[in-house]
Curated annotation (Swiss-Prot):
The modification Pyruvic acid (Ser) is found at S25. Its cofactor is pyruvate. This is Aspartate 1-decarboxylase. Pathway: Cofactor biosynthesis; (R)-pantothenate biosynthesis; beta-alanine from L-aspartate: step 1/1. Binds 1 pyruvoyl group covalently per subunit. Substrate binds at T57, G73, A74, A75. Keywords: Autocatalytic cleavage, Cytoplasm, Decarboxylase, Lyase, Pantothenate biosynthesis, Pyruvate, Schiff base, Zymogen. Its main location: cytoplasm. InterPro entries: Asp_de-COase-like_dom_sf, Asp_decarbox. Its EC number is 4.1.1.11. The gene is panD. It is found in: Cytoplasm. It comes from the Bacteria. Is synthesized initially as an inactive proenzyme, which is activated by self-cleavage at a specific serine bond to produce a beta-subunit with a hydroxyl group at its C-terminus and an alpha-subunit with a pyruvoyl group at its N-terminus.
Amino acid sequence: MFIEVVKSKIHRVTVTEANLNYIGSITIDEDLLDAANLIANEKVSIVNNNNGERFETYIIKGERGSGVVCLNGAAARKAQPGDIIIVMSYAMMDFEEAKTFKPSVVFPDTATNKLI
């Protein structure tokens, strides 16, 4: 039996930009992606701590060290700069493997979006 578990999580990161006229996605600083074991084009779930919105999109790699977290396209309507969000991805795995699996979780500084 396979189950879906949290694979990666960026916990409490600040939205720096919202670009409604882009083709959809979330742009994230490459340092955060590496630390959380996330890659470009990976599907992610977003939770907005400020307004309770929950939605899915995919990742675009942002400039390393920039602290960028930009919601693009329709997702730009779900959060605004300054909002605190959580970014999560999931993986399917065997039930027994899932019992011992440890997700990659990072807790960036919400003022700078840099790793602490």
